[in-house]
Structure formats: structure tokens, C-alpha cells
Amino acid sequence: MKMDVIAREQIIYGSLQGSNKNKDWTSRLPPPSAYTLDLMSKKAKTTTGGSSNGSNATATSTTTSTSSSIKHKQPAGSSNNNVGQSQSKKTKPSGSYNSNSNYYYYAADEEEGGSADYALSNYDKKAVEELSLRLLDELRAAKSRHLTCTEVSLPCDLTPSVAREIIRVSEKEPRGIRGCTIYIEFEDEPKNSRRIASIKVDSDTVSTFEVYLTLRQDHRGWTSLLPQFMKSLARTITISPEYTITKNKLYSADGLGARRSYSFGSHAHRPSAAIATPTN
């Protein structure tokens, strides 16, 4: 019995029915059908759209997080680029910058202006404090040298108030407070005053004006109730909160000094507001 094996070979290799030739697998494959192409294009669009949406969402979230982090970091001055640009802004105010940078530059300029005002205010406070301490030192030195007493009591805000007024009257002077010479006079009785100290604020600066500070003795304290012989034993002088500042310019257009008198101090009695200078 003879068996036909050609049909089996045709089934295995996919040859055409009724042909004894096998399919040539080295030949080029036929193009896919239009239906297959349509399905593949739709699938590709769906996949690409989903991936692009995901990437856009990722990029958007990344951009949002990045921009939000920049907004939080830039005002604090933690960005290296902004630090360098703000420094160049200080040296080159006329430079051109983008809108986002301008926001921070203007904020920095406002802060600098605020900090400048704040620094000036601190300078005034420091000058007042230094001059107030110098006045206290001169009063301590004059206590035993000119006042012949063991204790000098004065209102707690007297020397800061005097220092503020002296600095205020020196604002329009060509050399400011550095060109001031202060003469301190003490008046124990009406129209009976004597000079007890003098201060040249800056010894290296030529004086352009003088300030005469007149302090008065307060006779309303507890020592006024003592008998005369007890007053000499107490040897305590109480300074009144009232004082007089007289400003004398050492220059003018016509060659004569312009003498101006200013009276400062509270006329109200300030009870128990006193500082006792200890005995050296």
C-alpha cells in the first residue's frame, strides 16, 4: 500500500493545496490588511495619548513643585543665582532683569531701604546711649570735684533726654554731633550757677558749635525738709528734671556766632524717679 506524504508536508509547512511546492519563507511578507492597520493605529493613539497625558501630568506636577519650591526659596535668599544677581544689583542699579527677578530685587531694595532706616535708627539710639553715659561719667567726676557731696540723685531719664536733645540740635550742623562741645553748669540757687564739667564729643574734629547745659538743684525733695545743719551732714544733691540747653554757633555768614537758647525738660514733678550715683 502506497502512502501519500505530500499532503502531510503541505499541512505542516502551509503550502498550497494541490501543489507539490513548499512556500518560500525567504520571500518578503505581504502587507497587512487595512483593518489590521486601523486597529493598530487606534491602539497606538490610545497608548500614546495615555503616556503623553501621564508624562504631561508628571511634567506639570514636576513644574508645579519646582516653581512652588522656587517661590518659597527665592525670598529667603537660598538660591545661588539670585544671591549673585542681588549683589550685582547693589553695585549696578541700572541693570535690566526679568519680571520674576524684578519682584525679588524690588523686595530686596525695599528691605534694604527699611534696613537702612532701621540702621540709622539704631545709630541714633547708640549715639544717644553713648552720650548719655558720658554725661553720667562727667557728673560722677564732678560730684567730688565741684559739688562736694557724697551722692547725686537725678531722674532716671534725664541724661537720655539731654542726649537726645543735643543730638537733635546738631542735625543741621556741618559736622553733626562730632563738632559739638558741651559745657555743663549747675545752678543750686536762682541766678547762681557754676561750671562743673565740659565734654568735647570728638577730640579730632574742630568744634562748630557749643551747647551749654544748665542743670538745677531740686529743692522739693526730702532733703528740703531737713534743718540746715542736717543738710550739710546729708551731703546729697537732687537734680531737677528741668534743664536748659543753650546752643551757640561758632560760625555764620557775617562772622558772628548765632546764639540760640532752647529750654527743655518737664515742669511737672516726677516722684521717685531717680538714680543715685554711688560714692567712689
UniProtKB/Swiss-Prot annotation:
One of its GO terms (cellular component) is cytoplasm. It comes from the Eukaryota. Residues 39-96 are annotated as: Disordered. It is found in: Cytoplasm. One of its GO terms (biological process) is apoptotic process. Keywords: Apoptosis, Cytoplasm, Developmental protein. InterPro entries: RTP801-like, RTP801-like_C_sf. The keyword Transport does not apply. Residues 46-69, 77-96 have a biased composition (Low complexity). Coiled coil: none annotated. Induction: Expression is controlled by homeobox transcription factors. At larval stages, induced by starvation, and by hypoxia in midgut and fat body. The keyword Phosphoprotein does not apply. Inhibits cell growth by regulating the Tor pathway upstream of the Tsc1-Tsc2 complex and downstream of Akt1. Acts as a cell death activator during head development. Belongs to the DDIT4 family. This is Protein scylla. It comes from Drosophila melanogaster.
